[in-house]
Amino acid sequence: MKVYDCCDKVRELYSLIGSGDQGYIPQAITCAVKTLNDIAADEALPKEARERAAFAAANLLISDFEDK
């Protein structure tokens, strides 16, 4: 997926991180998994959103990518 395929909010933050106005997190995969886990665990959110977050987190955990 490319940044231009993402929503406006993602593109905005991408631009801010790239310009140095927003902090960059070197362990991006860990950050993503933690965020997706938080979404999946939040019972106040719709079930479909929680299931999608859980599926994405599980796939990241199984993938070959690893923060070092």
From Swiss-Prot:
Pfam families: UPF0253. It comes from the Bacteria. Belongs to the UPF0253 family. This is UPF0253 protein VF_0662. It comes from Aliivibrio fischeri (strain ATCC 700601 / ES114).
